[in-house]
């Protein structure tokens, strides 16, 4: 999938449509899928990541702003678009579907070597 990363009038911090647009990024039931004969629940990591970004957005709003929210808006949109461009599709086991920490997101991952950017 080809995606052009750019500033967007969508997915704002506190625009009239912000809550609806951010909520639409995560499918119903928070994106949990059930696999195998025992219907074991998993959450694709991208939905966990996008939900976390929305939580950060909402927390920022409750703390108030200094009147200049262009940088947080830029950062949220940049991270959102980056996640959509290269999503982590690893499945995270659901440990408590009704708890505040519903999934076990930690563990071994095969990742690109990010250290090369520091060389």
What is each PLM-predicted segment?
Residues 1-119:
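Low-complexity, small/polar and acidic-rich linker and loop segments
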């Amino acid at each position: 999938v080809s995606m052009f990363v750019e500033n967007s009038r969508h997915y704002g911090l506190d625009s009239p449509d912000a809550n609806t647009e951010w909520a639409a990024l995560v499918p119903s039931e928070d994106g949990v899928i059930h696999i195998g004969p025992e219907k074991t629940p998993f959450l694709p990591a991208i939905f966990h990541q996008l939900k976390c970004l929305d939580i950060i957005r909402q927390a920022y709003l409750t703390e108030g702003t200094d009147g200049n929210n262009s940088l947080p808006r830029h950062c949220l949109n940049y991270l959102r678009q980056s996640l959509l461009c290269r999503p982590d599709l690893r499945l995270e086991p659901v440990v408590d579907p009704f708890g505040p920490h519903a999934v076990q997101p930690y563990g071994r991952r095969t990742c690109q070597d990010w250290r090369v950017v520091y060389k």
